[in-house]
Amino acid sequence: MRITYKDIDYVYEILNGSAINKETTELKIILNGEPITLTKEDGKVWIQQAGEVTLEPDFAQALGRSVSLRYRM
């Protein structure tokens, strides 16, 4: 999938797509070749778990929202 953040295009792949439903609180994605894990806190805020690549909090939220819209979470 694609997302544009601050006028830059990114490509990401959802690794656990078949397991996503309305109760999903963790997303595993590959963003430009790097594994990223996002966790949903307080039922609405997506944050990045520790990893080699650090994303801006707003970008992590944008990725989580993008997946949420795609899978109607």
List PLM regions with ranges.
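Cysteine-centric segments in proteins
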Residues: 1-73
